[in-house]
């Protein structure tokens, strides 16, 4: 039987027989020891056998047209954004595949910056992309990040979320997608560099630079702050696709000032470009982001800039009815489980869209409006068995009138709210 101790009482590796003095580390198991050299050798053997299988995962990246078609199933409008995202994502994973081959041309990484008002579909686009590609996906909020050494989250915690989404499979996480929301909130507070330290603005941008470009980062497995006596997870960010999104409130004014008044020809009149509100975002350039407060190095690591337009009335109506996860379909299904049909008139849908535009909440505000309209319906109808159909019309939205109920006996009545009981 193999001895785990030599004559001097030193521990030995159960595989190669080297003592603890001859190796860097011995890992103990129940009645067995293995050294770091044997671990490395075993890893190489396993990688050689399984490596070819792992490479197949990304051999068939969907073509840009295919990515765009799937995005159309979930996201309404934003055609230009979907087109640029499809190309950027396709090129990113094509680049990963090409890295395994020895080629003279080195392809650089193309992270994405999405600019658009709240509720325009930035997060949904990123989530749908991850679903299409079947890769780990994590969402991080830039507002909670601070420079290392200050109260708040370190930028490495973003990577931890991705590792957790990949069930701690680091190799899988290294080909994932990270969406950093509210990136505009880490803009420099003023255009001129300040002598005071900006730990939640420019400091965060500086901390994100290396991760965005590609580095081997040390991530604390439990999150939180680093301390020298803990083990770290090493993750290479070279092949992680970063998508940064934000509303960038006020950038339209910067673009307007840059476009300014243009003179065409000699002696011609000064002419002002007339664009509709929201169209200015499509004219955004890196210099506008610089004036907004992003540092040049940070802008340089986000080469693909994609702008999303504010959603108009027609787009919001389509969002309510067309996608696979459309809100109207969801609420119809919920009442269908109680054997009641739910219907929204075309005028009601239009008024819901108008209300969302008034509130300036975009698609995100649609759910709260419908929730308010259907609260009494969802509360009362499950207890009744005489109702066949519930119709929500435009007056329900504009004047707060009750929905119309079609009864099983063929009659139609307005839904009545139960009278509150008088307190004794």
Curated annotation (Swiss-Prot):
A GO MF label: ATP-dependent protein folding chaperone
SUPFAM superfamilies, per the entry = Glucocorticoid receptor-like (DNA-binding domain) (SSF57716), P-loop containing nucleoside triphosphate hydrolases (SSF52540)
- Keyword annotations of the record: ATP-binding, Chaperone, Metal-binding, Nucleotide-binding, Zinc
GO biological process entries: cell division; proteolysis involved in protein catabolic process
Sites where the protein binds Zn(2+): 13, 16, 35, 38
Tell me the ranges covered by the ClpX-type ZB domain, including all copies. Answer: 1-54
Family, according to the entry, reads as follows: Belongs to the ClpX chaperone family.
Which function does this protein serve? ATP-dependent specificity component of the Clp protease. It directs the protease to specific substrates. Can perform chaperone functions in the absence of ClpP.
**Subunit and interaction comment:** Component of the ClpX-ClpP complex. Forms a hexameric ring that, in the presence of ATP, binds to fourteen ClpP subunits assembled into a disk-like structure with a central cavity, resembling the structure of eukaryotic proteasomes.
Name used for this protein in its record:
ATP-dependent Clp protease ATP-binding subunit ClpX
């Amino acid at each position: 039987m193999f001895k785990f101790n030599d004559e001097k009482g030193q521990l030995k590796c159960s595989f190669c027989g080297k003592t603890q003095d001859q190796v860097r580390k011995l890992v103990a198991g129940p009645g067995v020891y293995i050294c770091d050299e044997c671990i490395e050798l075993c890893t190489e053997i396993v990688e050689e056998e399984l490596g070819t299988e792992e490479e197949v995962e990304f051999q068939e990246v969907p073509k840009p047209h295919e990515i765009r078609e799937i995005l159309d199933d979930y996201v309404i409008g934003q055609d230009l954004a979907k087109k640029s995202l499809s190309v950027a994502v396709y090129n990113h994973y094509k680049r990963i595949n090409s890295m395994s081959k020895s080629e003279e041309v080195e392809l650089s990484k193309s992270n994405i910056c999405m600019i658009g008002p709240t509720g325009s579909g930035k997060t949904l686009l990123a989530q749908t992309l991850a679903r299409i590609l079947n890769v780990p996906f994590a969402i991080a909020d830039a507002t909670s990040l601070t420079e290392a050494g200050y109260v708040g989250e370190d930028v490495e915690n973003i990577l931890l979320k991705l590792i957790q989404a990949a069930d701690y499979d680091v190799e899988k996480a290294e080909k994932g997608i990270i969406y950093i929301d509210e990136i505009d909130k880490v803009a420099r507070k003023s255009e001129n560099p300040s002598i005071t330290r900006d730990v939640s603005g420019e400091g965060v941008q500086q901390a994100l630079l290396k991760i965005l470009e590609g580095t081997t980062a040390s991530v604390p497995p439990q999150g939180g702050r680093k301390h020298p006596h803990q083990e770290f997870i090493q993750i290479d960010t070279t092949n992680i696709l970063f998508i940064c999104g934000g509303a960038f409130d006020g950038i339209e004014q910067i673009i307007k000032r840059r476009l300014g008044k243009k003179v065409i020809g000699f002696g011609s009149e000064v002419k002002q470009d007339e664009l509709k509100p929201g169209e200015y975002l499509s004219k955004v350039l890196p210099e506008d982001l610089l004036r907004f407060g992003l540092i040049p190095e940070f802008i340089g690591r986000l080469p693909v800039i994609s702008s999303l337009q504010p959603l108009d009335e027609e787009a919001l109506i389509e969002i309510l009815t067309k996608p696979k996860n459309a809100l109207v379909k969801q609420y119809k299904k919920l009442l269908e489980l109680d054997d009641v049909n739910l219907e929204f008139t075309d005028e009601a849908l239009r008024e819901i869209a108008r209300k969302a535009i008034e509130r300036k909440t975009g698609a995100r505000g649609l759910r709260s409006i419908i929730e308010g309209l259907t609260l009494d319906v969802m509360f009362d109808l499950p207890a009744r068995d005489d109702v066949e159909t519930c119709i929500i019309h435009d007056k329900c939205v504009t004047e707060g009138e009750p929905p119309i109920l079609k009864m099983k006996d063929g009659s139609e009545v307005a839904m009545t709210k139960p009278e509150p009981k008088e307190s004794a």
